[in-house]
Amino acid sequence: TDMVMSFPYILLVLVAAAIFKPGLWSIILILGFVDWPGVARLVRGNVLSLRETNFVKGNVVAGMPLRHILFSEILPNTVAPILVYATSVMAISMLDEAALSFLGMGVQPPMASLGNMLNGAQSITVLTSQPWLWLPPGIMIVVLVVSINFVGDALRDAFDPSGGRR
């Protein structure tokens, strides 16, 4: 995980997108490959911190099987941070897909993509005289990302109501 995370994120995505054939599945696989180290690090950190808690140590001392400890104590306490992190990764991945499609390295034109829609509005005449070509996809990207971030905030508040918000 550290090796993948040591490379700049956008550079790794661009190089991988340039190597593989542009398309929906290649973008999904590339973004999944680049994003998995963050999830792995989050899960590992949560499991290591939960391993030191009294309720897990109590189960170990009581002789509970490892499967019971993992599925009834550690997994339920690890799901919440993963869901919250997944919403931010989803928003970032949507921006990355739009950027790659805008550059022509993502989803190809017969398939609809917000990046492809923005790609059609690159000339200054289109930008100034035809805002209906680029304004709706641009606004939609902003609305989608902000909405997903609101969902992530709501999930964080739902899983941790005393999370410091006043």
Residue ranges of each PLM-predicted region?
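Alpha-helical transmembrane segments of integral membrane proteins
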Residues: 1-166
